Amino acid sequence: MSKRALISVTDKTGVVEFAKELNKLDYEIISTGNTFKTLKENGVNVMQVEDVTNFPEILDGRVKTLNPYIHGGILYKRDKESHVETVNEHKIHSIDLVAVNLYDFEGTLKAGKSHDEIIENIDIGGPSMIRSAAKNYKDVIVVVDIKDYDSIIEKLKTDTMTLEDRKKLSYKAFSTTGRYDALISSYFAGEVGDTYPDILNLTFQKEQTLRYGENPHQNGFLYSQSNAKNPILNYEQLGGKELSFNNLNDLHGCLEVMREFKDSEEVVSVAIKHANSCGVGLGKDAFEAYTKCYEADKVSIFGGIVGITSTIDKATAEKLNEIFLEIVVAYDFEPEALEILKQKKNLRILKLAKIENSLQPYEMKYLDGKLLIQDRNNILAEKSENVTKEKPTDAQLKDMEFGMRVVKNMKSNAIAIVKNGQTLALGCGQTSRIWALKNALENNKDKDFTGAVLASDAFFPFDDCVTLAHEYGISAVVQPGGSIKDKDSIEACDKYDMVMVFTGIRHFKH
């Protein structure tokens, strides 16, 4: 009995050549719809599914291959006598290779098609054939990836197709149908408004193999979530080396801070080191913003990454090139500025799509077999309540907002001391709030903190932070409030003629 291959593909790249090679290997080809038409027109010896099933396609093509003459031919075990007797009794011909790729559900979704069009692009027969062939991988070769055509033909020609090869193809097949179903499930979750379903189907596809992970002894990879809404890591690389694991992590931190200021009339420049801000500056243009960012911490910025929410001009590029940086990311680059930055061969230059609010409603943290999920931290403050005798000036209120936008993106416990749209001192990742403040102040003793604003990601449990801030000349504090000892901090502010404003929103970040 001759071997048979069933071919039914949406992506017809390379399928004619593949089918012709199968013909040369004495495979009979069965096909459906447009695939049959393509193969026939290109000289492939092919028969229609109806020739096998003796039943026409019905329901506008919804039912083509859902038939015992198809699935029986795929699923029967060649080494089981009762199976062989059954297919012989019913005159079911074996199908030994199944090459299927599915209706482009994902592409239809991304194209913003109507609900009815999306539904019609849910493949039923394709996944069924793939799963049948993958289940019976010992007897049937399943092909879901056009990149596998050449290697499969070569193995068939040389009779070197091993059981391990078949198992790998089966694994790829089930991964493909699993991803496909997850995309459909995710679409329907959105349709019914179920943001946090009892069963969460997420699917990711490997985008990049990285040189290594966080450290050289760790492997590292980048996976992209299928159908992610407005991913923040959306950039075009214009120069420099390939991004590393740590580069990508730091870049994400940089873009999160840039997103905080996406609606600002001023330009923001942020410097990031180990995913934390080491300097942030606001300015009328890229040069002023970066200058303030750089002068905020001239030491820590070395070897960091810099993001700027505007187009980088020649003057800014020249200043950026004065120090070693891993990445420069901006909305765009003037031609002359780009050439200047490219003088540093290893500098990664990234052009960023304009940042929008994330449409992904939640953020995730993987905990070794479990997944923590929470709403995105999209709220800066729920109020601006002055709780002291002294009232904030307009300039102080502006710096308070600036400081809170910075500190909410730093690792807790976090403190940001700012003045005139520039960070003067930052303290983060400390196990006590007073240590975060001491760390910020003592590492920047050369700075003039007179009239500065202190922003805290969480409330003060004691009045020690206010007292220390006063000793350095800080005149205003913005914090969430909510401590049982708020009264102590308020009284300390009144004692020192300082301003304190409560926002009502805590910004822990771990």
UniProtKB/Swiss-Prot annotation:
InterPro entries referenced in this protein's UniProt entry, alphabetically: AICAR_Tfase_dup_dom_sf, Cytidine_deaminase-like, MGS-like_dom, MGS-like_dom_sf, PurH-like
GO BP terms in the entry: 'de novo' IMP biosynthetic process
Keywords: Hydrolase, Multifunctional enzyme, Purine biosynthesis, Transferase
GO cellular component, one term: cytosol
Gene3D superfamilies per UniProt: 3.40.140.20, Methylglyoxal synthase-like domain
Pathway linked to the protein: Purine metabolism; IMP biosynthesis via de novo pathway; 5-formamido-1-(5-phospho-D-ribosyl)imidazole-4-carboxamide from 5-amino-1-(5-phospho-D-ribosyl)imidazole-4-carboxamide (10-formyl THF route): step 1/1; Purine metabolism; IMP biosynthesis via de novo pathway; IMP from 5-formamido-1-(5-phospho-D-ribosyl)imidazole-4-carboxamide: step 1/1
Limits of the MGS-like domain: 1-144
GO molecular function, one term: phosphoribosylaminoimidazolecarboxamide formyltransferase activity
EC number annotated for this UniProt entry: 2.1.2.3, 3.5.4.10
Reactions catalysed: (6R)-10-formyltetrahydrofolate + 5-amino-1-(5-phospho-beta-D-ribosyl)imidazole-4-carboxamide = 5-formamido-1-(5-phospho-D-ribosyl)imidazole-4-carboxamide + (6S)-5,6,7,8-tetrahydrofolate; IMP + H2O = 5-formamido-1-(5-phospho-D-ribosyl)imidazole-4-carboxamide
Protein family according to the UniProt entry: Belongs to the PurH family.
Domain statement: The IMP cyclohydrolase activity resides in the N-terminal region.
HAMAP family: PurH (MF_00139)
PANTHER family registered for this protein in UniProt: BIFUNCTIONAL PURINE BIOSYNTHESIS PROTEIN ATIC, BIFUNCTIONAL PURINE BIOSYNTHESIS PROTEIN PURH
Protein name (record): Bifunctional purine biosynthesis protein PurH
Organism encoding this protein: Clostridioides difficile (strain 630) (Peptoclostridium difficile)
Gene assigned in the entry: purH
